[in-house]
Design a protein with these regions (language model features):
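Bacterial Sec-dependent N-terminal signal peptides
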Residues: 1-23
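Mature soluble domains of exported/periplasmic/lumenal proteins and thiol-rich metal-chelating peptides
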Residues: 21-142
Length: 142
């Protein structure tokens, strides 16, 4: 019985560790905060830590955005929420064909540090990722 309780506690800990954790700005490395401030001056943010990276969530020019940083301050990507109707036609067609009866809850444009653009469609609790032309790439848990 003791082994079962210990095992359950371990699994629960691992499960919670896999999700993003909100953190106080004071716990964000100064290199990350400096990099964010250079790219988005004067913007207030909320911070989360997930898989060793720091995610800033904020609003800029009326857009809901987020930016992902390595511990050393290197930004790896930014994400801007967009209207579902602004997703490429190929994304809409893919979802219609492969998720019959489901609707896209949210859309986003992802820009990687190297300038590569991808799109994200949240469908049925999952993030469906597409390239810049709307070609399906992968599904991630939401």
């Amino acid at each position: 019985m003791k082994k079962i309780i210990t095992f359950t506690a371990c699994i629960t800990s691992i499960t919670f560790a896999a999700f993003a954790q909100k953190i106080d700005a004071g716990k964000v490395p100064s290199a990350v905060k400096t990099s964010f401030a250079k790219q988005y001056p004067g913007v207030a943010t909320k911070w989360e830590k997930e898989n060793g990276k720091y995610e800033a969530s904020f609003k800029k020019d009326g857009n809901t955005m987020s930016a992902l940083f390595e511990k050393n301050g290197t930004m790896t990507e930014s994400e801007t929420d967009i209207k579902v109707s602004a997703l490429p036609a190929a994304v809409l067609a893919y979802v219609k064909a492969n998720y019959k009866g489901k609707t896209i809850k949210e859309g986003a444009k992802i820009t990687k540090a190297d300038g590569t653009v991808m799109y994200e469609a949240e469908v049925d609790g999952k993030d469906v990722i597409f390239d810049s032309n709307g070609k399906f790439l992968k599904v991630m848990k939401g």
